[in-house]
Regions:
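PP2C/PPM-type serine/threonine phosphatase catalytic domain
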Residues: 1-222
Length: 222
């Protein structure tokens, strides 16, 4: 007997999301921000993309993930937010969008006048390893932690306005702010959920994980 197995890719459907659903979102989104060289030398561009997963496409479900990216051309600060909406939550596609947008807007405002923060970052660079710097810890927490708290409040308000439960908008969140200084890059991050962020140096083949992914009682729980 001869058995012929079909190409697995041909078994998967790509059903467009119904545009009439609540909180419709395009099945694919991407953005590229070009950051020009300045007095500190070459900078890093920002690229982000979000594509509906294969299982969602097969069933015609909406893309749950989202992102929001920003670069302040006047002071050099980068802001990056990525959210992976929990698939078990019916409006996670909205929760992820609300979380990303709220965090970036909060950080944009917080970093409009970063003189005190940058002063502490420069001071941190001159301290010996292991020496604590409570001042910068507080400043960073107020920015990235404050952004996450604001995002949580925004999701609660969205749920209330639509007479839904907050859990219907469940989402993970990855947030980072960074800037290039004369001595190198400063990166601060905050995350909620089972995602992960890292710094990758291609030349040195170096990877630095910026935290520990959250885990639930079972695999895939957020």
């Amino acid at each position: 007997k001869v058995a012929v197995n079909p190409d697995p890719r041909s078994l998967w459907k790509d059903i467009p999301t119904d545009k009439n659903i609540k909180f419709f979102k395009e099945d694919y989104s991407h953005e590229y921000i070009t950051v020009v060289e300045n007095e500190k030398g070459p900078q890093k561009d920002i690229v982000a993309a979000s594509k509906r997963g294969r299982s969602h496409a097969h069933e015609g479900k909406a893309r749950d993930d989202d992102f929001n990216i920003y670069h302040n051309d006047s002071n050099g600060w980068y802001i990056i937010a990525v959210a992976d909406g929990a698939g078990s939550a019916k409006y996670s596609r909205k929760g992820s969008a609300v979380a990303c947008e709220t965090c970036v807007e909060f950080c944009k405002t917080a970093l409009e006048n970063p003189i005190e923060l940058e002063k502490e970052i420069i001071a941190l660079n001159s301290t010996t390893e292991g020496q604590s710097n409570r001042a910068i810890s507080t400043l960073i927490y107020n920015i990235v932690g404050g952004a996450a708290h604001k995002a949580h409040r925004a999701i609660l308000e969205t749920a209330s306005a639509n007479e839904d439960q907050p859990r219907d908008y469940s989402t993970t969140l990855l947030l980072a702010i960074c800037k290039k200084f004369d001595f190198g890059w400063f990166v601060a991050s905050f995350w909620v959920g089972d995602g992960a962020m890292c710094i990758y140096d291609k030349e040195r083949q170096y990877i630095k994980l910026l935290g520990t992914p959250d885990g639930g009682e079972y695999a895939g729980q957020t």
